Amino acid sequence: MDLWFSELHTPYVKFSIQIDKQLHSEQTEFQRIDIFESKEFGRMMVLDGYVMLTEKDEFIYHEMIVHVPMAVHPNPKRVLIIGGGDGGTARELLRYKNVESVDLVEIDERVVDISRKYLP
């Protein structure tokens, strides 16, 4: 049986990925969290029906969200991440020797728990 995940972008456009299996699904107080396994992208985290990250290309998002502001700040020492429960943004920030502390605030602790389990 073919399993597919589709993310609707507009009434005329949707992005579909063939799925090997669903590893996790739950509805939290804040959102629905799904983890899928796919041949093309590896593991995928989907929140409320939208792909948040995939193993194959998550670094692209996290590098851009971190390296651009870090390039223009003269000497960042303390950083606050709002959201980012998957940990990728924190990982990229901790590559900078001048960063002394990173605080991460995530509204949904299950995103952190599930990321630790399925997206180490």
How should each PLM-predicted stretch be described?
Residues D2-W4, L53-P120:
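The AdoMet/dcAdoMet-binding core of the Class I SAM-like
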Residues M1-M44:
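N-terminal auxiliary segments of SAM/dcSAM-dependent transferases
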